[in-house]
Amino acid sequence: MAEHPPLLDTAQILSSDISLLSAPIVSADGTQQVILVQVNPGEAFTIRREDGQFQCITGPAQVPMMSPNGSVPPIYVPPGYAPQVIEDNGVRRVVVVPQSPEFHPGGHTVIHRSPHPPLPGFIPVPTMMPPPPRHMYSPVTGAGDMATQYMPQYQSSQVYADVDAHSTHGRSNFRDERSSKTYERLQKKLKDRQGTQKDKMSSPPPSPQKCPSPISEHNGLIKGQNASGGNTGSARNRSGRGRSCTQVDPEMEEKDEETKAFEAFLSNIVKPVASDIQARTVLLTWSPPSSFINGEVNETAVPELFNYEVLVSSTGKEGKYRSVYIGEETSVTLNDLKPATDYHAKVQAESNSIKGIPSEAESFTTLSCEPDPPNAPRIANRTKNSLTLQWKAPSDNGSKIQSFILEWDEGKGNGEFCQCYMGSQKQFKITKLSPAMGCKFRLSAKNDYGVSDFSEEVLYYTSGCAPSVPASPVLTKAGVTWLSLQWTKPSGTPSDEGISYILEMEEETSGYGFKPKYDGEDLAYTVKNLRRSTKYKFKVIAYNSEGKSNPSEVVEFSTCPDKPGVPVKPSVKGKIHSHGFKITWDPPKDNGGAPINKYVVEMAEGSNGNKWDMIYSGTTREHLCDRLTPGCYYRLRVYCISDGGQSAVSESLLVQTPAVPPGPCLPPRLQGRPKAKEIQLRWGPPQVDGGSPISCYAVEMTPADKDEPRDVYQGSEVECTVGSLLPGKTYSFRLRAANRIGFGPFSEKYDITTAPGPPDQCRPPQVTCRSATCAQVNWEIPLSNGTDVTEYRLEWGGVEGSMQMCYCGPGLSCELKGLSPATTYYCRVQAMSVVGAGPFSEVVACVTPPSVPAIVTCLQEISDDDIEYPHYSPSTCLAISWKEPYDHGSEILAYSIDLGDKQPLTVGKMTSYIIDSLQPDTTYRIRIQALNSLGAGPFSHTIKLKTKPLPPDPPRLECVAFNHQNLKLKWGEGTPKTLSTDAVQYHLQMEDRNGRFVSLYRGPCHTYKVQRLSESTSYKFCIQACNEAGEGPLSQEYVFTTPKSLPAALKAPKIEKINDHICEITWEYLQPMKGDPVIYNLQVMVGKDSEFKQIYKGPDTSFRYSSLQLNCEYRFRVCAIRQCQDPTGHQDLVGPYSTTVFFISQRTEPPASSNKDSVDSARTRRTLSDEQCAAVILVVFAFFSILIAFIIQYFVIK
């Protein structure tokens, strides 16, 4: 409410949303001072004059006030604020600032707030203080005495990036060093006075009130004595730190610390800055959330991009906010705002579906502008000579509407308008008009910012006389029970004049005259519920507010007739003939109000036929149906046609014509070529079946030299074979068909001549066996049937049903050679002529005499796996098998095996034999022949077989490497790289707990590692060698014993410094190993020594080393020793040493530097952690696994 002080930044004051009071003290002489109260534009200051009346002074203005005692009087401020006296270049100013730790530099804005109440330090405050003045404009109503309360608007240049250069009245503000220090002291006092800590950067300062007071709103602006207090209360409720109105959100308590920290980071966002404020647009900019919270750096991971949501409210800071923007940009231009309206904007940050608390609200007010376009004026009253128009005021957009401008076209209708009224009234009466005169009007509003756009154009008419006689109604469409009528306006009637019409109707037979059927403003009407085919008279009367017109001329229209009813089902008149019949029918019972014009008869063929053909159309009610097919079904129906339309079809009549015998068939035809004794005939059905299906055919044959016909076929088939004919004879055939009525006429005759016949069947041939492999066949000449025999065919075979032709020629005998002894053969003979081949003779069987056996086949070696002979040795034996040959009629008695140089072997009747007593690794040529009582058969094919060498002896087995779990065995003199294709294979076996030897390894390698054994345990092994000759003998039993296991490697020892010369080394404890005690050996290497020295050996797990030297480097390591008690005596098993630990002795510093000593001590105790040791072991294990896999791949598989 006063001038912005130079000490406190204007942007800081404005961001707190309070009204300011700055009272510059003009004279500081200590007696009487004049205090100037600066009232900012848009604000008001209430004082009480000497006469006791209250006066409201609106800004911009300076109000001089006198201080009688020379001191600065107390300034009344609302709750949550405090007055501060600041001296600037000899001028003291009273500044109202908020009591909040949140009073910090922020965004820039312009605030128009409600004025403060009167200052009690200057004027007495009565009991009944009038309420402070309301806001000086309202964009909603736009009416009233707004001119006296108009508030000048700020321009967009009021928002600056440099706060020090901001001044409301254009005066430059300055800040010297003294004022800066004063400002810092003021900020510190405000924070100390507040006494509370803020939860988040976005939370407003706490309020001394328990609950926020109700906030009223007018035109989107907050009013009340302390709008900031309401905002504070709401923010405290959100953060859960209010006193009596506190609400705790249970979901916030369940969130983890990381989510809470990230929400706090997102909530640390500064309120947006409003710039470039126009009447309907504003530019909002903001910055991403800051990583500094309460002066500390937030270690929460900051994402690269944020999503921002801009919330805007026009109903006050505590009003309802709506989202106007969601995106990743840090600036947005808001459009479609209301002019001269207070808005409050917040921004809310979001990332990974986590939202922060919205920022503080940035308040701004849009600029005023010209009014909105008003609505078109409405007609309030009209007469024949005047029109009275009314209208409503539009939104004034922040400036009171000064006048309205009403224009009209003077009734000319040429589109040119002139002003007929300008003033502040909201109605106007235009006089001196003509009756039924049409005028166009438009309206605009004007304020201090200009003239609005014109409203829509409207056309209004003055009142006129009663309507003239309208034209007669016209029939547009007629139906059976309705008539659609249409009429026009009377001539010369204005288009906007409200005219109603009365439609009257008269029915000829009613006798009641005309009756109204319609009364309204429409120009068309459909009269319903009329009778069909009836005439009606109509007339129309027009009327308005001035009276009724004369009725129009009477017109007459008729409704349409209805379609007739369904005719009666047609019936047959007289007898039904095979080719026609007569039908008749009766007219429908209802003709639809019009005479029947014609009847239509339709007919469909078949009992279920749907293809209807029209066969009659006329006025008579009977019809002769002719040219029909006998024995066929016909369906007939009838319908009638009148002026009202076509009726539905009647029920169908089903009629069947009587059947007749079928018509003549076409002569039968020869199918294929005629044969000597039979012919094949085929025919088709007759063209006319007589109305009944063909059930039978009859074929009649007559020889050419005889006149005695006879039936050769009767049946339903369309083909037949006529046999028992003579070759070269002529025969006549004719055909007839029959149905259920009877046979039809014969067809024409068809002559066919048979072909010449082949020779007759020969008599059975005679077979004479000359030897076991040769036979003679003889036959006789058969009857030739009129043609000479040209050749004979002899078929011969060992199976009766599968004989092959072995001779073809004119001879009467044939000699067959190459026959099998003691075999049954079959033969037959056939004679042929130029006509064809005669039938074969009967089959004759003969048997050839016996002979020596046939050749032996399938001679082969028997596999070793298939031999079950216990004394078989592949080195001295050969096993052969063969297939038994044909014995040729004499039983096989024995077989002779030829081995080449050796004497042939004679064996009994068998098909396999093992030849023994052979030389190892020797090749033999073997063949075999069969023997019977008639002699020896031919030798079989020769095969070459070779005996295998003798199996090898077992190698010597020895143990080349061992530990407590593994034994590496070696045998033979093989090279390390042994191929899997080596001839010699080795089979290693080990004795199990049950005393049985189990297989460990079978392959060509000469070494094998036995794993997962028990320590200090004896195991028995044996081995045998194998090659293609077989498995060699087992070796003797070898006994190998595993040693005891060594202790495991210890972790790196821990070193703790006792003083400058003593340190304590500790290490982990190992459990006794299977009853054997464990002791420890501690070694140290001092300085640049190259060897470790033992400093302790015993069962303890710690040792104090007291020979430390200052600034000297020590290396410690420790190992475990297992003390074994064997029957042979005492034995120590030393385990691997632990990781070496480095230690540097340094002088102990005073206690003040205890932190540094702890750091140095920590540095001297750098050892590998358990995780690092596990990682190293895992890497080593992986390396050795890969190496072993490579060795197996290279030496074993390849």
From Swiss-Prot:
Acetylation listed as a keyword: yes
Tissue distribution: Testis. Localizes to the acrosome of spermatids, as well as to Leydig cells. Can be detected on the acrosome beginning at steps 2-3 and continuing until step 12 of spermiogenesis.
Superkingdom of origin: Eukaryota
GO annotation (BP), single: fertilization
Record's keyword annotation contains Acetylation: yes
Main location: Golgi
Region feature (Disordered): 188-257
Protein keywords: Acetylation, Golgi apparatus, Membrane, Phosphoprotein, Repeat, Transmembrane, Transmembrane helix
Cell compartments where the protein resides: Golgi apparatus membrane
Recorded GO CC terms: acrosomal vesicle; cytoplasmic vesicle; cytosol; Golgi membrane; vesicle membrane
Transmembrane segments: 1177-1197
InterPro entries xref list: E3_ligase_FN3/SPRY, FN3_dom, FN3_sf, Ig-like_fold
Family to which the UniProt record says this protein belongs: Belongs to the FNDC3 family.
Function: Mediates spermatid-Sertoli adhesion during spermatogenesis.
Identification of the protein by name: Fibronectin type-III domain-containing protein 3A
Gene: Fndc3a
